[in-house]
């Protein structure tokens, strides 16, 4: 291992979670020990890890008691040894390894205590004992440290591995008591070399999952988000905490740094047997900021974009504010040009997500085959309610208009009270603008990959400056 990694391990051992304020505006992930245990168990199911152990000691005369074992040249049971009568007993090999039961204990500030309880079936043969079959219960106990890989990902590193041999039973054949004792001693010596590599293989699989936490997630036409570790991970007796820093990049790969909230997030306590991930206000600001700078929040609304019950003509406008038309005749189509010149403001608090979009609305009279005539301009604020739906990889957002307030900025005829148009404008925005806006929001807010935790069925909790997703394993 590299010296730098050892140094990180030492520092990690001193790090334990603190309750209260989250001193970051990044993404916080709390991985419950049950989720870690499930990842380890899944790595053993259906994979090659256990099958590889079966091929370790299989060839005749190469078994535990074969040519290279106790019966081999110089072994205790070799020719001339104390038990030369059974010198031909050979080929004792692992025939089956029962799917281990996984037990996890988190050691705050230290690492992980990992136990695998399994049952090993062995068989062999000899001229005196005939077909021989043994079954042994084994507990593999290992101490695992949390470290950081050279590329900055969290990594589990095996520090110590021991095997404790439990009950051994003879399921077939005859074996003299002295030989049975020697077999037991041999298994105690050999099994660590066979089963501890299983732990190494399991950790390799889990480390691949942990490495996927720090990944580049596309944001569609807006760019991408790269998740990196902001600080060293922390360990409590119930969960591992990862402080993840989301780095937003443009399509060209340039880092985009939107303003971040100054106040830290006060995290709610995590319940036992649950995992959490937070989506910070910063990511909401980033997505809406990118939409604004890319012009995705701007829209020109024509009569074809609204249903017939929401007319866009000078006749209907005259009924609400006749002084706004000047000398224009009735029956002409209207064009509404919506421009968002500043980034929207997102408010996360009191279990509610509110989006405020400052908008400038230009109202023009559209003349067939002619240049539109500017009538007046309004400045307004669209207040939108957000509905959040988590999936496996994203937090999806859909918006609905709560209210639209406007003030007259300029008029080419007479001044008037623009608030009289708010209800009519709200109908137009709901019919035409909200659909386009929600289409742009289909990119969603990406979630970091946390040990394949599926947040699709998570409970969504909106707290101040963050959204918390909680899922039970």
Curated annotation (Swiss-Prot):
It comes from the Eukaryota. Residues 1-20 form the signal peptide. InterPro entries: Bactericidal_perm-incr_a/b_dom (IPR017943), BPI_fold-BPI/LBP (IPR051660), Lipid-bd_serum_glycop_C (IPR001124), Lipid-bd_serum_glycop_N (IPR017942). It is found in: Secreted. Glycans are attached at residue 139. Disulfide bonds join 161-196. The gene is Bpifb3. Keywords: Disulfide bond, Glycoprotein, Secreted, Signal. The keyword Iron does not apply. May have the capacity to recognize and bind specific classes of odorants. May act as a carrier molecule, transporting odorants across the mucus layer to access receptor sites. May serve as a primary defense mechanism by recognizing and removing potentially harmful odorants or pathogenic microorganisms from the mucosa or clearing excess odorant from mucus to enable new odorant stimuli to be received. This is BPI fold-containing family B member 3. Belongs to the BPI/LBP/Plunc superfamily. BPI/LBP family. The keyword Signal applies. It comes from Rattus norvegicus. Highly expressed in olfactory mucosa but undetectable in thymus, kidney, lung, brain, spleen and liver. One of its GO terms (cellular component) is cytoplasm. One of its GO terms (molecular function) is lipid binding.
